[in-house]
C-alpha cells in the first residue's frame, strides 16, 4: 500500500508553540496569588533588577581598581595643500578674485563639513594671489601666500 505524503495528512503531534502560563488568576491555575515570585521582599516587587547589586557583597566594579583616563578629543582638521588650491584655480572651479571660504571648499567636496577646521600646507606651488579662509597654516604656506600678495601689491602700484 503506497502512502502519498500530502500537506493535509502530516501530523507532528505537538503544538508548534507552547502556550504560556497565565499568571495571577487564582490558586487553581498553579501560578496564582504570588505568580511564582514568592512572598514579599525586593524581588517580589515590580522593577526588581538593581544593576550591579550582589546581595550586599561589594560589587565587582567597586572591587576592581580604576584604570586609565579619558583623553580630550584632538582638534580634527582637513589638510589642504597649495597645489590643490592652484589646481582648482587652473581648472576654473575657483575664482581667484573672490575669497576661498569654507562654504566654497565644501561645495567642491574638498572638505566634509563647513564646521570642520582647515589647515593649509605649503606642498606645491601657488602662482596666483588668493584670499583663503583658514584655521591653521604652515610656515611654508604662509610664506608663499604672503610673498605672492606682496608681489601683487608692488605690481599694482
Swiss-Prot record:
GO molecular function: rRNA binding; structural constituent of ribosome
Record GO cellular component, one term: large ribosomal subunit
InterPro entries registered for this protein in UniProt: Ribosomal_uL15, Ribosomal_uL15/eL18, Ribosomal_uL15/eL18_sf, Ribosomal_uL15_bac-type
Superkingdom of origin organism: Bacteria
Keyword field contains rRNA-binding: yes
GO annotation, biological process: translation
Keyword RNA-binding: yes
Family named by the database record: Belongs to the universal ribosomal protein uL15 family.
Reported function: Binds to the 23S rRNA.
Summary of subunit composition and partner proteins: Part of the 50S ribosomal subunit.
Protein's recorded name: Large ribosomal subunit protein uL15
Amino acid at each position: 500500500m503506497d502512502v502519498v505524503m500530502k500537506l493535509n495528512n502530516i501530523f507532528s503531534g505537538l503544538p508548534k508553540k507552547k502556550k504560556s502560563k497565565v499568571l495571577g488568576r487564582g490558586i487553581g491555575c498553579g501560578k496564582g496569588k504570588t505568580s511564582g515570585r514568592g512572598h514579599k521582599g525586593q524581588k517580589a516587587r515590580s522593577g526588581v533588577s538593581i544593576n550591579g547589586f550582589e546581595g550586599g557583597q561589594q560589587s565587582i566594579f567597586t572591587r576592581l581598581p580604576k584604570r586609565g583616563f579619558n583623553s580630550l578629543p584632538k582638534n580634527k582638521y582637513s589638510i589642504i595643500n597649495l597645489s590643490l588650491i592652484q589646481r582648482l584655480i587652473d581648472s576654473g572651479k575657483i575664482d581667484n578674485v573672490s575669497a576661498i571660504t569654507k562654504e566654497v571648499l565644501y561645495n567642491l567636496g574638498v572638505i566634509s563639513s563647513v564646521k570642520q577646521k582647515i589647515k593649509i600646507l605649503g606642498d606645491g606651488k601657488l602662482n596666483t594671489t588668493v584670499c583663503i579662509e583658514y584655521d591653521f597654516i604652515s610656515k611654508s604656506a604662509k610664506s608663499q601666500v604672503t610673498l605672492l600678495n606682496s608681489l601683487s601689491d608692488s605690481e599694482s602700484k
